[in-house]
């Protein structure tokens, strides 16, 4: 029985789609670790600490969810956390090929680590952090796509970034 799962991502910022998958993973596994990646190849709008804090706020009502920032290989982080499952989201068919390659690479690096794929609720299937930031950057209302605290933090972050 798999009891510890990791849902990894950049979460820049966490969206309602992410939150939906976290809620469902929390029902499937005894303990869910949200692994927030410090990915040097991406240039996140929020710092790692800010992303950890936002995800903590959004998931505070879930007793079996823990939020941890990490850097390095995901398989090494999973081993450190004693997790045997990776939870990944599939929004569309276009996500499948990349996720399939990633799952196979992770399996090659850590044969005992399983990947489990969840699809978001239909109303969240098109939401991505990138699209949310783009809408917010152009002054659009993102409150239907993210938690209210995330919308507030994103508005403040963008206001500070304007010249």
From Swiss-Prot:
Residues holding substrate: 10, 42, 74, 88
Compartment(s) where it occurs, according to its Swiss-Prot or TrEMBL record: Cytoplasm
Pathway, per record: Cofactor biosynthesis; coenzyme A biosynthesis; CoA from (R)-pantothenate: step 4/5
Keyword Isomerase: no
Cofactor needs: Mg(2+)
Catalytic activity: (R)-4'-phosphopantetheine + ATP + H(+) = 3'-dephospho-CoA + diphosphate
GO MF term list: ATP binding; pantetheine-phosphate adenylyltransferase activity
Site (Transition state stabilizer): 18
Gene Ontology biological-process entries: coenzyme A biosynthetic process
Residues where ATP binds: 10-11, 18, 89-91, 99, 124-130
UniProt cross-references to InterPro entries, sorted A to Z: Cyt_trans-like, PPAT, Rossmann-like_a/b/a_fold
One GO CC term, this protein: cytoplasm
Major place of residence: cytoplasm
CDD domains assigned to the protein according to its UniProt record, in alphabetical order: PPAT
Keywords associated with the record: ATP-binding, Coenzyme A biosynthesis, Cytoplasm, Magnesium, Nucleotide-binding, Nucleotidyltransferase, Transferase
Assigned EC number: 2.7.7.3
NCBIfam families in the record: coaD_prev_kdtB, cyt_tran_rel
HAMAP family associated with the record: PPAT_bact
Role this protein plays: Reversibly transfers an adenylyl group from ATP to 4'-phosphopantetheine, yielding dephospho-CoA (dPCoA) and pyrophosphate.
Assembly mode: Homohexamer.
PANTHER family, per database record: PHOSPHOPANTETHEINE ADENYLYLTRANSFERASE (PTHR21342:SF1)
Family in the record: Belongs to the bacterial CoaD family.
Listed name of the protein: Phosphopantetheine adenylyltransferase
Species name: Shewanella baltica (strain OS195)
Name of the gene: coaD
């Amino acid at each position: 029985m798999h009891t510890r799962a990791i849902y990894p991502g950049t979460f820049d910022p966490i969206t309602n789609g992410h939150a939906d998958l976290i809620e469902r993973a929390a029902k499937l596994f005894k303990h869910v670790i949200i692994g927030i990646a410090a990915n040097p190849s991406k240039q996140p709008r929020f710092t790692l600490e800010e992303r950890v804090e936002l995800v903590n706020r959004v998931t505070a009502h879930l007793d079996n969810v823990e939020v941890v920032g990490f850097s390095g290989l995901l398989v090494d982080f999973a081993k450190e956390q004693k997790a045997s499952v990776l939870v990944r989201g599939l929004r569309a068919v276009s996500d499948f090929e990349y996720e399939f390659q990633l799952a196979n690479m992770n399996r090659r690096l850590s044969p005992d680590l399983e990947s489990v794929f969840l699809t978001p609720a239909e109303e969240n299937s098109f939401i991505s952090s990138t699209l949310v930031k783009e809408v917010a950057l152009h002054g659009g209302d993102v409150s239907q796509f993210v938690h209210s605290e995330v919308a507030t933090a994103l508005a403040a972050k963008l206001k500070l970034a304007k010249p």
